[in-house]
Every structure is written in C-alpha cells, then in structure tokens.
A protein has these predicted regions:
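Class I SAM-dependent methyltransferase SAM/SAH-binding core
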Residues: 56-58, 62-115
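Core SAM-dependent methyltransferase catalytic element
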Residues: 191, 198-216
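Short, glycine-/aromatic-enriched active-site segment of Class I SAM-dependent methyltransferases
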Residues: 159-174
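Conserved class I S-adenosyl-L-methionine
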Residues: 1-49, 64, 68, 100
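Short alpha-helix
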Residues: 174-189
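A short glycine-rich, Lys/Arg-flanked "PGG" loop and its adjoining helix->strand segment in the class I
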Residues: 138-150
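A conserved beta-strand element that flanks and buttresses the S-adenosyl-L-methionine
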Residues: 127
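Conserved beta-strand signature within the Rossmann-like core of class I S-adenosyl-L-methionine
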Residues: 152-159
Length: 216
C-alpha cells in the first residue's frame, strides 16, 4: 500500500470543496446504508475480474466503494483508489487500517479523473460513483475508456433524476447527467452488459443506478 500525489490543477475547486466536507460526505453515505447496498449488489452481480486484476476506483471519496470491492473480491487484485480531494484520500487510506490483510491490495492516489496517471489500456476494471457528475460526461468517459483494456469493464453508478438527486446536487455541488446522455456516451466505447435499479426500499435506490459495460 502506498500514497502517491499526482494531482493536477484542473477541477481543483471541486477537490478543495471536498477537502472541507469529507466528513459530512462519509457520514451521509454510511448512515444511508450505501455499503450494505453495494454488498448486496456485488453478491447478486459478481464483478467480472480474475486473480491479479488491475482495478481503479475513480473518485474514491473516503473509500466506501473501495471497501465494498475488497469485501466482494476474495482473491488478490491490485486496486488503485484515486480522488481529487487530498482530505478524502487520506481518510480512505486511514480507514483501510480496519481491514487487516488487504492493505497491500490498495494504492491511494490523489489525482484528476480527466488526466489519469495510467497508460493506455492498462486496467481491467474501472468503477466510479459520484465523480463523473463533476466533469463533462464525454471527457470523463473518454478518459476512463482510454485506460481500460479491450474486453475490460466499466462499472458506473450515476445519479438518476429524482428529488433526492436534486438535494444531493445542491449539497455536494455537482450536476447529474441525463440518463439518455449517460447511455449514449457510454456506448461510444462500451457494450452495456446490464443496467440495474437499486430497490426503492434502499436509500441508494432513491438516487443511483448501476451500469456495467464492457469495452469493445
């Protein structure tokens, strides 16, 4: 496990804002059962990776999705957890001390989703939740597609239109993308394997969907 600083100035304002609210962000998603919902999703939809896979959590925040990946994947993989907010990355790194035995599987990096510090076609899986809403959608998906190997996968958890989605936009200062635009931009590089609506009785179902797509 290591901590690497590779931030760029682009979108620095978003990173600075999250530096200030990292604790609020972490508390919000822990209270609403986000982690449990991810566990249930991964149990029903096993991730398409094998031993030694190279995985990126793009926009990892305080590490909730990173932890869900570690719980879902029982064999050794290499995960990079990247976020623009240094405070969030440090919080995510510290939280992993409560996951003994898996620390070596994760590298924490402060960096920019629009300028990823990875070679072309070098990753097997990219997961992202709550990050593409801060960047032009086409630019974000283009950059994620650049680093995913042919046959690799993208798991995207976009915000879908809802009153809760509007509230989250105001609270966390992002702008969600229309579902049709998300689908169209994704299909420029990927074949959509499935789209999933989280159950409405789960808090995550009020604002998020899941899209798994394979690079063609």
């Amino acid at each position: 496990m290591e901590y690497v600083l590779t931030a760029t100035k682009t979108k620095a304002r978003a990173g600075s804002y999250y530096d200030r609210i990292a604790r609020l962000y972490d508390l919000t998603f822990k209270v609403n059962g986000y982690g449990r919902s991810l566990d249930q999703y991964f149990a029903a939809h096993p991730l398409p990776v094998t031993r030694g896979a190279k995985i990126l959590d793009a926009g990892c925040g305080t590490g909730l999705l990173t932890h869900a990946l570690l719980r879902a994947i029982r064999f050794p993989v290499s995960i990079t957890a990247l976020d623009l907010s240094q405070t969030s990355v440090v919080a995510a790194r510290k939280s992993l001390y409560y996951s003994p035995g898996r620390k070596r599987d994760v590298t924490f990096t402060q960096g920019n989703l629009l300028c990823l510090p990875f070679a072309d076609e070098s990753l097997d899986l990219v997961v992202t939740s709550g990050a593409l809403e801060y960047v032009p959608l086409a630019d974000g998906i283009n950059e994620l597609a650049r680093v995913i190997a042919p046959g690799g996968h993208l798991l995207h958890l976009p915000i879908h239109p809802s009153l809760i989605g509007v509230f989250l936009e105001i609270l966390f200062r992002f702008k969600s993308h229309p579902p049709r635009e998300v689908k169209d931009k994704t299909e420029r590089h990927f074949r959509i394997v499935h789209q999933y609506r989280f159950p409405r009785q789960q808090a995550i179902g009020w604002s998020k969907t899941a899209i798994l797509a394979q690079k063609v």
